[in-house]
Design a protein with these regions (language model features):
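Conserved glycine-rich Rossmann-like NAD(P)H-binding loop of the short-chain dehydrogenase/reductase
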Residues: 30-46
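Catalytic Tyr-x(3-8)-Lys segment
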Residues: 195-216
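Catalytic loop of short-chain dehydrogenase/reductase
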Residues: 89, 99-109, 113, 117-119, ...
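Substrate-binding pocket helix/loop in short-chain dehydrogenase/reductase
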Residues: 94-97, 101-106, 198, 202
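Conserved Rossmann-fold SDR core element
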Residues: 159, 168-184, 230-237
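Rossmann-fold cofactor-recognition segment
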Residues: 51-68
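C-terminal substrate-recognition "lid" of short-chain dehydrogenase/reductases
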Residues: 210-237, 242
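Conserved glycine-rich cofactor-binding loop
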Residues: 16-18
């Protein structure tokens, strides 16, 4: 299936770290033309170095919560076959309701719901009929925990967006991958120095006995990019988390 993507032009929003970086690496190995989009110039430059062995992605520094910047991104990017978005800013969003700040909630909603809508609004019209948009939701929509109200709501909302866009933007395909607990830098933001013990505890609770990796999620995203008969779908890659 990977051969179907050779030469395809793919924008990866959030492709400079975590799951997005793993996606970028897999796509470069499949000889795709990859444009990595992110807010941080330092992270973009670091991603280029990390990916050097696989190819040379293009880089574009953009705040995807800004409609003007998203519009300019697609005006300057040239043709695009597929769009992937793994970006999320959930700093401060994992809190009990009395401590949840409106700023953190607004930031998380804008990064994970508003941004994908803006990307589709300005990107879909420039994409061919065989193209696709793949977003990332998350296990919190299905197995919420204390402090998870904001993230559960946001992931559930995003999956509604996916289904609606799959209808409205057809024949363009729109899907989501719903990761479970995955070892990415985001856990440093959530748990700080406690991130490793937390991940170890999570692994013990899962049927597969481990937390996920960026490549686990990248495999699923690449599948959705290449499968032309899948749309409006949420693909769960969660180590069996929904079963326990």
């Amino acid at each position: 299936m990977g051969n179907r993507l050779v030469g395809q032009r793919i924008v990866v929003v959030g492709g400079s770290s975590g799951m997005g970086l793993a996606v970028s690496a897999q796509l470069l190995r499949r000889h795709c033309e990859v444009l990595i989009v992110g807010r941080s110039r330092d992270k973009l430059d670091a991603a280029r170095e990390a990916l050097r062995a696989f190819g040379a992605p293009r880089l574009h520094q953009v705040d995807v919560t800004s409609e003007a910047q998203v519009q300019r991104l697609f005006e300057e990017s040239g043709p695009v076959d597929h769009l992937v978005c793994t970006a999320a800013d959930i700093r401060g969003a994992y809190e009990l309701l009395p401590q949840l700040s409106l700023d953190a909630l607004d930031r998380a909603i804008r990064s994970k719901v508003v941004a994908p809508i803006l990307l589709a609004k300005h990107g879909a019209q420039r994409m061919p009929a065989h193209g696709s948009i793949t977003l990332t939701s998350g296990i919190a929509a299905y197995r919420p925990r204390p402090k998870g109200v904001a993230v559960a709501a946001i992931n559930a909302a995003l999956e509604g967006v996916v289904r609606a866009m799959a209808v409205e933007l057809a024949p363009l395909r729109v899907n989501a991958v719903s990761p479970g607990w995955v070892r990415t830098p985001i856990w440093k933001d959530v748990a700080g120095a406690d991130s490793e013990p937390l991940l170890a505890s999570m692994a013990e609770q899962l049927p597969v006995g481990r937390v996920g990796t960026g490549d686990d999620i990248a495999d699923a995203i690449v599948f959705l990019l290449g499968n032309g008969y899948t749309t409006g779908t949420v693909l769960h890659v969660d180590g069996g988390h929904r079963l326990v």
